[in-house]
């Protein structure tokens, strides 16, 4: 099953991308500025939406998914550099990225909080965190159904958790939430957040510049 998962993933996502998810992805990706990091990029479904002139470091831990992403990277108007890397332990320098993007990714990362901590580390102060994610529903009934279905769904869908609480995790690690926009269904959300400013000294220019 795992061997064929990348192919099955693209097959299942094709209709969803055309109906709704594609425009949502575009709206998220087009907000990315400067040097961009994309984590858990999967088969590269975001790549088509990056504007020309953008440079993206795209990471993915599953080399089978990355193999399918290579063709999309070559077709993108942007410069996409693919890196085999775990979002929970990024082999990247601290404080170098202006924007970080994740598209339907946090639900499959074993420790989302570790991944968010890594994003904090590699983003510049006040850098943008841009996400399209499915999360646990705010509806009591739907949320309980997600809780019930998640153990089985994880087995057949590459570890995906239907009841992930991504918004709460983002706030808990210290990002500043700018907006959370629900779509239809309401458990698919666009999240925009900002990295914390690590210190006043880093936020202000040297004092001699004010003289």
Identify the residue ranges that each predicted region occupies.
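Short glycine-centered segments of the SAM/dcSAM-binding site in methyltransferase folds
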Residues: 55, 126-128
């Amino acid at each position: 099953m795992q061997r064929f998962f990348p192919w099955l993933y693209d097959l299942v996502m094709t209709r969803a991308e055309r109906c709704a998810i594609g425009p949502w992805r575009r709206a998220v990706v087009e907000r990315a500025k400067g040097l961009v990091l994309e984590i858990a990029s999967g088969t590269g479904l975001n790549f088509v939406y990056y504007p020309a002139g953008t440079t993206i470091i795209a990471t993915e831990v599953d080399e089978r998914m990355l193999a399918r992403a290579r063709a999309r990277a070559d077709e993108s108007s942007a410069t996409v550099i693919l890196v085999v890397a775990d979002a929970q332990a990024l082999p990247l320098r601290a404080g170098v990225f202006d924007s970080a993007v994740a598209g339907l990714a946090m639900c499959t990362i074993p420790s989302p909080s570790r991944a968010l901590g890594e994003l904090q580390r590699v983003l510049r102060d006040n850098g943008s965190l841009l996400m399209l994610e499915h999360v646990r529903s705010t509806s009591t009934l739907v949320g309980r159904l997600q809780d019930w279905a998640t153990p089985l769904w994880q087995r057949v869908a590459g570890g995906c958790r239907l009841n992930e609480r991504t918004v709460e995790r983002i706030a808990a690690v210290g990002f500043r939430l700018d907006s959370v926009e629900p779509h239809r269904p309401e458990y698919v959300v666009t999240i925009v957040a900002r990295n914390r400013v690590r210190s006043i000294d880093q936020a202000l220019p040297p004092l001699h510049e004010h003289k």
